[in-house]
């Protein structure tokens, strides 16, 4: 495996473990054991567990936002319909076997006591989501697009939390 492939493999394995077990509960030893790599390899790519978590969150942010955009663009053409299609995306995500709630809220919950790079990544993701919802609200010519974007974000957050706790994907409807 090439150097870049090892880094990506570590991020993939860490993503699965952190989502399933939690950021604190999943240890570095578990990550390297499941990845089948040496601890020195991990530390060649990441200075600390926190750096690995930041890399995981960045990857998740990129994948999540790309997947939502693709789904929304595929399902809807009209601006108003695109706003509603964001909830169809959520429903599909909730039905995925790898759905364990919002990884950004989990990270913020586990590392949010003080300002740090992990909390910062969670905040960046939430702000980027609000910006996307605002973009959709502006395209739909809605009044107060930022306020509407924040409200849509709250609906998404609530639906995600309820789906995680209850296992009911219909909370996105």
Language-model-derived ranges and their functions:
Residues 55, 69-96, 139, 149-152:
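Hydrophobic alpha-helical connector segments
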Residues 62-65, 81, 114-139, 150:
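Amphipathic alpha-helical packing segments from all-alpha helical-bundle domains
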Residues 6-15, 31, 56-60, 64, ...:
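Generic hydrophobic, amphipathic alpha-helix propensity
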Residues 9, 16-51, 55:
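Helix-turn-helix
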Residues 96-116, 120:
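Amphipathic alpha-helical segments used for helix-helix packing
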């Amino acid at each position: 495996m090439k150097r870049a492939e090892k880094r990506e493999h570590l991020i993939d394995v860490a993503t699965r473990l952190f989502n399933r077990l939690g950021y604190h509960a999943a240890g570095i030893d578990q990550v390297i054991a499941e990845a089948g790599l040496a601890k020195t390899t991990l530390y060649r790519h990441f200075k600390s567990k926190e750096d690995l978590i930041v890399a995981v969150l960045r990857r998740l942010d990129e994948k999540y936002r790309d997947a939502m955009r693709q789904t929304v663009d595929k399902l809807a053409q009209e601006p108003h319909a695109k706003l509603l299609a964001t909830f169809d995306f959520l429903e599909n995500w909730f039905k995925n076997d790898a759905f364990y709630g919002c990884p950004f809220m989990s990270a913020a919950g586990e590392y949010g006591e003080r300002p740090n790079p992990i909390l910062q990544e969670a905040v960046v993701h939430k702000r980027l989501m609000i910006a996307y919802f605002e973009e959709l609200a502006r395209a739909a010519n809605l009044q107060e697009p930022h306020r509407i974007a924040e409200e849509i974000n709250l609906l998404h957050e609530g639906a995600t939390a309820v789906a995680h706790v209850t296992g009911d994907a219909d909370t996105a409807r």
